Design a protein with these regions (language model features):
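Helix-rich, typically C-terminal accessory recognition domains appended to large enzymatic cores
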Residues: 6-167
Length: 167
């Protein structure tokens, strides 16, 4: 398998993430094109989720959490999950468990952030209640910012591109 051909076909970030996801100390990596393609789908999911969040920003959007009394149960849930993720990934990185760290970030983004939290906020984003809408946007942006920071060492190109668009 030629790295240059894989980069041209699937992108640098997908290849880097694949290599990291399957990296374990003392283990050879069994690289296949199907695995790289699978992580390219993950890159696309991240890109689409980011576009969705960014297209819902208002003019007064900012990257800071709202007051605690404004947070709804779903907001508190995702922030709790995010804090746990940050602690676990930090611990994994300190132990050089890169594959474990990226798998946790992958699972959080795919399952918690995209499949659950974004879906839970859709009604609020289209709501007439400006405070509920603004709170949802602020939490969406904050969590996106944090996951981009966690992903950046492994997917520097797409994370930088998205991060430049965050207020």
């Amino acid at each position: 398998m030629r790295d240059v051909a894989m980069i041209e076909k699937y992108g640098t970030d997908a290849l880097r993430f694949t290599l990291t996801a399957f990296a374990a100390m003392g283990r050879d990596i069994r690289l296949s094109e199907d695995r790289i393609e699978g992580y390219r789908h993950f890159v696309n999911k991240l890109w689409n989720a980011s576009r969705y969040v960014l297209m819902n920003l208002g003019e007064d959007a900012r990257n800071e959490l709202p007051a605690l009394d404004k947070l709804e149960i779903a907001d508190k849930w995702v922030l709790s999950k995010l804090n746990t993720l940050i602690a676990e990934v930090t611990e994994n990185l300190e132990k050089y468990e890169l594959g474990v760290a990226v798998q946790k970030v992958y699972d959080f983004i795919w399952d918690t952030y995209c499949d659950w939290y974004i879906e839970l906020t859709k009604a609020r984003l289209y709501s007439e209640d400006a405070i509920r809408k603004q709170t949802a946007i602020q939490v969406l942006v904050y969590v996106l910012d944090q996951i981009l920071r966690l992903l950046h060492p492994f997917m520097p190109f797409i994370t930088e591109e998205i991060w430049q668009s965050i207020p």
